[in-house]
Amino acid sequence: MLDTGTLRARFQQHYGIHPSVIVRAPGRVNLIGEHTDYNDGFVFPVAIDRATYVAARLRHDQLVRVASSDLNEEDTFAIDQIERSNRPWHNYIRGVALALRVAGHPLLGADLLIASDVPRGAGLSSSAALEVAVGYAFQVLNNLNILGEELALLAQGAENNFVGVQCGIMDQLIAVLGRADHALLIDCRDLSYRAVPLPPSVAVVICDSHIPRTLAASAYNQRRQECDMAVQLLRRWYPGIRALRDVSEDHLAAHSDALPEPIRSRARHVVRENRRTLQGAEALERGDVVTFGRLMNESHASLRDDYQVSLPDIDILVETAHHLAGCYGSRLTGAGFGGCTVSLVERNEVESFSRDLLRVYHNATGRTATIYVCRASDGVGRATDNAGPQE
């Protein structure tokens, strides 16, 4: 957790005045339900206790000034003349401001200072945390009445339409709606959700492989296209389907010969992953961590074999975790081709689990991974810890 008192001091040093508000939006890790969100399916993420913070103060002109404490970079743009920048991180902020204006929300300019302890490039949704935090800062500064789901959709729209990344809704939605000590089962079609408590005896352990995700963007778009192609082919027999969410395992079995590879395997992963996600949420609701862990393991096998988004070194992390004491289940999380694994581990075994996982991975690959032991946190809101009086 970042110290908000330090953020206030940095803001004052940079802008010569205290911020009027500091907000935070968390990163996320998805326990199960991978590559299902853009297929109108089900996901089961938690908001983690690492977040992006925005210290902000309203201006009374059209100017937005942004300083990144982490990158030591700045951006300035006019709120009524928003254009794309050649600096990618600028566009997340500009895109959110534009999305708010297009939706009819009047904005004044602002001074913003951004800092984050969400690891970038690890698949923990640092970009969604940034979008949601900036959107919420604009909301607070301008006294806007925006429901949580609307803020998530606006942030997703900014990433889709302005940044140019065709992400699903999960990352932004959990950044808005996350609940401490709970995972959220989210229906990505109608955005309905229910909170499921996490057993207090179990820890969420994230392991960053530090494998650069150089193929993630192109492969992600390719997988989306393959899923869309599966839907188009299956509409010959099931004209009412809108997405793979509407396809059952029986549908696939009846017409698998009509789906060429790799489209058949992609569809099989999504359809079965939706089932696993629903079963997993039900298992945790009744406190059955063993069943949930087994479903996590099945999910990884499907991501590896059917969706083909894992890598050998990621498989080493997962297989090693499976054999360590206290681990109920482990899998790749995020888009794939690097990034992180997530494991559910008995809390009193976390220290030895982490030590042994890092050792085996380093011996096998030569890489040094990073462990994050996370707690499920609340979604976006004001950050008041150590902030002092907010003016």
Curated annotation (Swiss-Prot):
Mg(2+) binds at residues 127, 159. This is Galactokinase. The active site is at 171 (proton acceptor). ATP binds at residues 68, 121-127. Substrate binds at residues 34-37, 220. The lineage of its organism: Bacteria, Bacillati, Chloroflexota, Chloroflexia, Chloroflexales. It is an enzyme of class 2 (transferase). The record marks 28 as: Transition state stabilizer. SUPFAM superfamilies: GHMP Kinase, C-terminal domain, Ribosomal protein S5 domain 2-like. Its EC number is 2.7.1.6. GO terms for molecular function: ATP binding; galactokinase activity; magnesium ion binding. Pathway: Carbohydrate metabolism; galactose metabolism. The gene is galK. The keyword Cytoplasm applies. InterPro entries: Galactokinase, Galactokinase_bac, Galactokinase_CS, GalKase_N, GHMP_kinase_C_dom, GHMP_kinase_C_sf, GHMP_kinase_N_dom, GHMP_knse_ATP-bd_CS. It is found in: Cytoplasm. It comes from Roseiflexus castenholzii (strain DSM 13941 / HLO8). The keyword DNA damage does not apply. Keywords: ATP-binding, Carbohydrate metabolism, Cytoplasm, Galactose metabolism, Kinase, Magnesium, Metal-binding, Nucleotide-binding, Transferase. Belongs to the GHMP kinase family. GalK subfamily. One of its GO terms (cellular component) is cytosol.
